[in-house]
């Protein structure tokens, strides 16, 4: 499995996303640039310029019509994915750490930072698509349709459950919350990870009925959207920055490594900078992929399950297309079931 190395950023990666077809990959880093790439061959399609601070997050609407980014310049920007023009800027009092479109693309959530006397919030905007042909995209609302304020512990990550029914948020204190996406009312809060170990990433399954969290407490957990019950726990030996669920095969991919500030001039192996594959059902580690020279900050899996991409503190995105042995790999019990 030879990776394609994408060199488009000068500073560490913060998030990468495939579009829904999986043919494009979007990456954001601390160097203010959003890059678009072809995922098949790693060719750079273009860049989107306009932000004045480190980019923390990116998401792409279901039809790849709009892109949303959140940054340290306290704005969320909406982009025309095709032309690269910025069609809307929403301003906030603090930095924006996570954006995500709802499954139908009609709404966009943004998670804002707790700072300078402002509490962390989750805001939701209604998104309009002009005439559907990519025109009039700049006709957007100015005010959010919903605002959730995190009184206790600030939200670090958030996303939409199946059918956009709930907003699921991961918090700085290691807990996970479920909010009603229409009223903003908190329905449940569960201490999923060790107290005060923040949740760094939260990614959903293909059908959005469950999700995986990655935490500083060196574990990742699969949790049900409906009742926030912890279904599986994957234990690693290093703090985790990111975790993703693979379609097609029952695996999860975890990424992390020693915190960037703790890294000394040791070998890449000692820093534990590998992508780890675990079996989703049996919770065993089944393999690792090396390559990054620094912690892994973000992992995204191709929506068809044919490959994955990882972005690291080293400023590189590595795109991997899975080989035949990956798809052939089975546990004995799975093989027996297939034979029946």
UniProtKB/Swiss-Prot annotation:
Any one Gene Ontology BP term: formation of cytoplasmic translation initiation complex
The keyword Protein biosynthesis is annotated on this UniProt entry: yes
Gene3D superfamilies xrefs: YVTN repeat-like/Quinoprotein amine dehydrogenase
PROSITE patterns, per the entry: WD_REPEATS_1, WD_REPEATS_2, WD_REPEATS_REGION
GO CC term, one of those recorded: eukaryotic 43S preinitiation complex
Entry superkingdom: Eukaryota
Main location: cytoplasm
WD repeats: 8-47, 50-89, 91-135, 150-189, 194-233, 291-330
Keyword Coiled coil: no
A Pfam family recorded for this sequence: EIF3I
Keywords tagged on the record: Cytoplasm, Initiation factor, Protein biosynthesis, Repeat, WD repeat
UniProt GO MF annotations: RNA binding; translation initiation factor activity
Protein name: Eukaryotic translation initiation factor 3 subunit I
Entry-linked SMART domains: WD40 (SM00320)
InterPro entries in the cross-refs: eIF3i (IPR027525), WD40/YVTN_repeat-like_dom_sf (IPR015943), WD40_repeat_CS (IPR019775), WD40_repeat_dom_sf (IPR036322), WD40_rpt (IPR001680)
Entry's family note: Belongs to the eIF-3 subunit I family.
Subunit structure: Component of the eukaryotic translation initiation factor 3 (eIF-3) complex.
Gene symbol of the encoding locus: TIF34
Summary of the function given for this chain in its UniProt record: Component of the eukaryotic translation initiation factor 3 (eIF-3) complex, which is involved in protein synthesis of a specialized repertoire of mRNAs and, together with other initiation factors, stimulates binding of mRNA and methionyl-tRNAi to the 40S ribosome. The eIF-3 complex specifically targets and initiates translation of a subset of mRNAs involved in cell proliferation.
Transmembrane region(s): none
Signal peptide interval: none
